[in-house]
Amino acid sequence: MANIKSAIKRAELNKVANERNAQQKSAMRTLIKKFEAAPTEELYRAASSSIDKAASKGLIHANKASRDKARLAAKLG
């Protein structure tokens, strides 16, 4: 456990950020699974948007976002 006050604060902030990131990644994965279960244009847009948001926030790498979107598009068409 950290002894320095700033390190204690950073540890708490890291914990909060980790929980938030996990929720956002989970939501993204859920949308992808919904699309894969029933590929529709509406679900594709939702999943694609979620992937873009995750990439812009640094949750996933930009190349992974591009790859995931391409795979979803292939399943759509």
UniProtKB/Swiss-Prot annotation:
Q: GO annotations under biological process?
A: translation
Under the heading PANTHER family, the entry gives: 30S RIBOSOMAL PROTEIN S20, SMALL RIBOSOMAL SUBUNIT PROTEIN BS20C
Q: Which HAMAP family match?
A: Ribosomal_bS20
Encoded by which gene? rpsT
The protein's name: Small ribosomal subunit protein bS20
Family of this protein = Belongs to the bacterial ribosomal protein bS20 family.
Query: What is this protein's function?
Result: Binds directly to 16S ribosomal RNA.
The record's keywords, sorted A to Z, are:
Ribonucleoprotein, Ribosomal protein, RNA-binding, rRNA-binding
GO: which molecular function terms? small ribosomal subunit rRNA binding; structural constituent of ribosome
- InterPro entries the UniProt entry points to: Ribosomal_bS20, Ribosomal_bS20_sf
GO CC annotation terms, alphabetical: cytosol; small ribosomal subunit
Q: Where are the transmembrane segments?
A: none
